Amino acid sequence: MMENYKHTTVLLDEAVNGLNIRPDGIYIDGTFGRGGHSRLILSRLGAEGRLLAIDRDPQAIAVAKTIDDPRFSIVHGPFSQLADYVDERNLTGKIDGILLDLGVSSPQLDDAERGFSFMRDGPLDMRMDPTRGQSAAEWLQTAEEADIAWVIKTFGEERFGKRIARAIVERNRIEPMTRTKELAEVIAAAMPVKDKHKHPATRTFQAVRIWVNSELEEIEQALKSSLSVLAPGGRLSIISFHSLEDRIVKRFMREQSRGPQVPAGIPMTEAQLKKLGGRELRALGKLMPGEEEVAENPRARSSVLRIAERTNA
């Protein structure tokens, strides 16, 4: 059914420009999706260039397999394991750029059968790879109320997390929920105050999705791995869509741009300081979509692109 869903790639040119493509370079698109970024990268590569794409969504893999290009290869798996994929190809330390477009994609949101949307009724799944791990329904049916409340508060930043968790557990005791519409209705009924600008299920659906897919852990691991796989001068170009994602990316780039921090008052020789190493990255700034892009694609409104460059440290 995926062919019915139109996907507009957010910050397409800006993210690829951020990679500073060399015609003979080796690049990674860690979130292939429907291939918008990958196709643009390929258009800028010469005959000797290479692109390794990664995605854990089987539908994205099916799209990627339609690209008949000897410079292109696709891996079915999470981008957190990019260091393994690179090592298997003997490319560690040779990657010239990594692009990550974080979060859920429009085709995933718009396909009711994937279970990501509270606006369309479908199976309560939410897995980016439906062949692995627990579905949202399975987790909500087996998790403790306190754990559900913590997830909703932590990953959804929802102040009524405890109320919602209690309502979910009580409903599942009566009859286990298996549909997105059922969960959305339970959440709405549990909310004592409604936000007129936001659907009551927005934050909880985000939280459950992040938890089911281990999204924030995936980002943290991929960022750590990037330091070992990037060549000196290699670029990181990362698009995030909500504050939890962007906070992780921003903190990582800031910390790696500062280098090791020595507490004040601790004497160290120049030789000792050198052993600590220098800055791993040079932060090159951030970009946000313009008014025209947001008008054409409202989902771009919250996106932030951050770019950094690997140093010689």
Swiss-Prot record:
Keyword Transferase: yes
Organism: Klebsiella pneumoniae (strain 342)
GO terms (BP aspect): rRNA base methylation
Binding site for S-adenosyl-L-methionine: G35, G36, H37, D55, F79, D101, Q108
Catalytic activity entry: cytidine(1402) in 16S rRNA + S-adenosyl-L-methionine = N(4)-methylcytidine(1402) in 16S rRNA + S-adenosyl-L-homocysteine + H(+)
Coiled coil (UniProt feature): none
Enzyme Commission code(s) on record: 2.1.1.199
Protein name per the record: Ribosomal RNA small subunit methyltransferase H
UniProt keyword terms in alphabetical order: Cytoplasm, Methyltransferase, rRNA processing, S-adenosyl-L-methionine, Transferase
PANTHER family assigned to the protein according to its UniProt record, in alphabetical order: 12S RRNA N4-METHYLCYTIDINE METHYLTRANSFERASE, S-ADENOSYL-METHYLTRANSFERASE MRAW
Signal peptide per UniProt: none
Physiological role: Specifically methylates the N4 position of cytidine in position 1402 (C1402) of 16S rRNA.
Subcellular location: Cytoplasm
Family: Belongs to the methyltransferase superfamily. RsmH family.
Gene Ontology molecular-function annotations: rRNA (cytosine-N4-)-methyltransferase activity
Annotated Gene Ontology cellular component terms: cytoplasm
Enzyme's top EC category: transferase
HAMAP family assigned: 16SrRNA_methyltr_H (MF_01007)
